[in-house]
């Protein structure tokens, strides 16, 4: 039997998992590159203690949990319907269900060929590598032997980009695109990670070029900005707040280019935090497009990606 495993970072399923999510994320050596395990655990613990109260408050505003799992389950259901002969499941990096649980499912169903699809459109050591590494290490640890396939990215996939275009058009609901500046908001990374050879920035920039070539001159202008910065180190620029300041007085549509599924970074940061900033500084109109989520076109893209693996 064959199986598709959708990999993602995960998100708290309830408020009690907020601390677990933060602790696991900051203890990831791909996120916090401290070689000494004990030191990294200590630093992760300290960061978690400093951030958990605010993070918990943010998730309370989202109904007490991350929306990521909801959208993932809906996506799996539609993908499973499209591929009835393939077992479709998920494995999250920082919250349940973890890779170990997914592997137990695969072993129970006697799956001998596994297609791992990290739901990150652009490759990064902090996301794609981390999720794949975690899954393979867990499979090796429990003695699970199968034929494995995986992908590094899929931002060039034609159907995936059609899914994005559909979301952008849907967000404007018939309004004149020429009146809007389209801002692609990408999850930021520390500059040091890029300088060490991580291809994330290059792939995001290439993706923006692909999308703008499809959209041609429909919008007044196209921009790339970065969100979700954390800590005092130098991060990718410009920040989304800086870009909003630059474009204040104009109509702005934001598309979260780093994400395939809506999560706290879209539904809290973009829809709530940055919306408040936009209103405060005088942005004429501020809109955020939804991620592809479980759209039919994104399901088409995943089927296409699977069939090409």
Curated annotation (Swiss-Prot):
What InterPro entries would the database entry show? Ferrochelatase (IPR001015), Ferrochelatase_AS (IPR019772), Ferrochelatase_C (IPR033644), Ferrochelatase_N (IPR033659)
Q: Name one GO biological process term.
A: heme biosynthetic process
The EC number(s) this enzyme carries: 4.98.1.1
UniProt-annotated location(s): Cytoplasm
Q: Name one Pfam family in it.
A: Ferrochelatase
The record lists the catalysed reaction(s) as: heme b + 2 H(+) = protoporphyrin IX + Fe(2+)
User: What keywords sit in the KW lines?
Assistant: Cytoplasm, Heme biosynthesis, Iron, Lyase, Metal-binding, Porphyrin biosynthesis
Primary site of residence: cytoplasm
Pathway(s) of this molecule: Porphyrin-containing compound metabolism; protoheme biosynthesis; protoheme from protoporphyrin-IX: step 1/1
The Gene Ontology terms for molecular function here are: ferrochelatase activity; metal ion binding
Binding annotation for Fe cation? 187, 265
Question: Which Cys pairs does UniProt list as disulfide-bonded?
Answer: none
Gene Ontology annotations for the cellular component aspect, listed alphabetically: cytoplasm
The protein's role, per its UniProt record: Catalyzes the ferrous insertion into protoporphyrin IX.
- Name the protein family: Belongs to the ferrochelatase family.
Protein name, UniProt field: Ferrochelatase
Q: Which organism is it from?
A: Nitratiruptor sp. (strain SB155-2)
């Amino acid at each position: 039997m064959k199986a598709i495993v959708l990999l993602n970072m995960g998100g708290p399923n309830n408020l009690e998992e907020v601390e677990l999510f933060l602790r696991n994320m900051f203890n990831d050596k791909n996120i916090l590159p401290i070689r000494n395990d004990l030191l990294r655990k200590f630093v992760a613990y300290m960061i978690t203690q400093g951030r958990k109260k605010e993070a918990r408050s943010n998730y309370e505003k989202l109904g007490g949990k991350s929306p990521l799992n909801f959208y993932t389950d809906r996506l799996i259901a539609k993908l499973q319907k499209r591929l009835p002969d393939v077992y479709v499941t998920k494995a999250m990096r920082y919250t349940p269900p973890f890779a170990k649980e997914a592997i137990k499912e695969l072993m129970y169903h006697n799956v001998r060929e596994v297609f791992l699809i990290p739901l990150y459109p652009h490759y990064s050591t902090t996301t794609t590598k981390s999720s794949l590494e975690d899954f393979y290490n867990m499979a090796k640890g429990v003695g699970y032997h199968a034929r494995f396939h995986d992908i590094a990215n899929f931002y060039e996939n034609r159907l995936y980009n059609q899914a994005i275009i559909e979301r952008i058009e849907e967000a404007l609901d018939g309004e004149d695109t020429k009146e809007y500046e389209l801002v692609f908001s990408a999850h930021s990374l520390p500059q040091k990670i890029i300088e060490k050879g991580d291809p994330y920035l290059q792939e995001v920039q290439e993706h923006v070029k692909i999308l703008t070539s499809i959209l041609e001159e429909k919008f007044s202008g196209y921009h790339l900005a970065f969100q979700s910065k954390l800590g005092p180190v130098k991060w990718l620029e410009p920040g989304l707040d800086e870009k909003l300041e630059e474009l204040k007085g104009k109509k702005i549509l934001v598309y979260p280019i780093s994400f395939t599924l809506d999560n706290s970074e879209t539904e809290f940061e973009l829809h709530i935090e940055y919306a408040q900033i936009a209103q405060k500084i005088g942005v004429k109109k501020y809109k955020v497009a939804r991620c592809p989520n479980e759209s039919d076109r994104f399901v088409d893209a995943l089927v296409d990606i699977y069939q090409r693996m």
